[in-house]
Amino acid sequence: MLPPLTTKANDQLNRPEVWAWAEREVARQGAPTLAPQFIQAWDYARNNFFMADHLDLERQIRFVNMLVCGDRTVTAGAYPVRYRQTPAVFANGNEGANWQEIPRLMSQLCKSPLFWDREIEEFCIEFLRIHPFVDGNGRTASILLNRRTWKQDFISVPTVVGWIEDARV
């Protein structure tokens, strides 16, 4: 069951630039029919990711990923850990983290200060290098990135020069 949109969400989510960003992201990442789920996940992230919840960040990220992938059977409080259990090879030939290391790497990343200390781009780069999920990693990273930056503008990928070419674990 998807969480209901927040009361504040109606005004924020009906803005044309929000839907344009969502449609651009899901199309860019090969899931053009999942814009509503992407919006739902972004609404959840922007209204539930707070510093007071920093010890729960990993669980929240898993929930956002399940939402962007259209999993309607989840609730925010109870669901299984669904990290990938296969190798991941990127289009540029680089590989994601060894799947057996994903729980440890995600735990370390989420306990680091990167997400909360204005180092969100570095957090997202590390998240994408780990590539913890079977599907929806890019959409999840976009939501995480824009959780911190959306009031200025929506961005698709971290702006650190060369990070895609250098993406290695």
Residue ranges of model-derived segments:
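FIC/Doc superfamily catalytic core
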Residues: 1-169
